[in-house]
A protein has these predicted regions:
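Iron-associated oxidoreductase/ferritin-like identity signal
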Residues: 1-153
Length: 153
């Protein structure tokens, strides 16, 4: 991956996080309205974390010398679908390949320690994110869907 390709991929990551953040805020609001407050709290925390990560991408791009016109890719928002079904919310967000993709991006920034360090931090967060989603999907299978929803109240 060339340096230019790596920067574009890095900027795209910011756009994805802005979009995911909006999606997760929507999931949180909908789940809270339905009384699934534990799940709503989880989505809200994820939304806030992803918003912060998107801001970190923007800040790092500016530190790397990107001008406002160059930040267009990172500033756009990738749109994600909205699901009113909590199981679909979790399944749609569960992306086991994300850690591998982020690891490749971290390798592309081997000569840029500050950027690589940020990406490695985000990989740890993504692993935690995948763990709770996998855990919740297992709970749905083990408890049954209705019992899972009751547990989320």
């Amino acid at each position: 991956m060339t340096k230019e390709e790596a920067l574009k991929a890095f900027a795209y990551m910011g756009a994805v996080w802005f979009g995911n953040s909006k999606q997760h805020f929507a999931f949180s609001a909908y789940d809270r309205l339905n009384g699934w407050n534990k799940l709503a709290d989880k989505w809200k925390a994820e939304a806030e974390e992803e918003w912060d990560e998107a801001e970190e991408v923007l800040n790092r791009l500016v530190e790397l010398g990107c001008k406002p016109a160059d930040l267009q890719e990172a500033m756009k928002t990738i749109e994600f679908p909205f699901y009113d079904d909590p199981k679909q919310q979790i399944e749609s967000d569960y992306q086991p390949t994300a850690v591998e993709e982020m690891s490749k991006l971290a390798q592309a920034f081997a000569d840029d320690y500050p950027t690589q360090k940020l990406i490695l931090k985000w990989i740890d967060g993504e692993k935690e994110h995948m763990e709770w989603e996998a855990q919740y999907l297992k709970l749905i299978d083990r408890l049954g869907y209705d019992n899972f929803l009751m547990a989320m109240m």
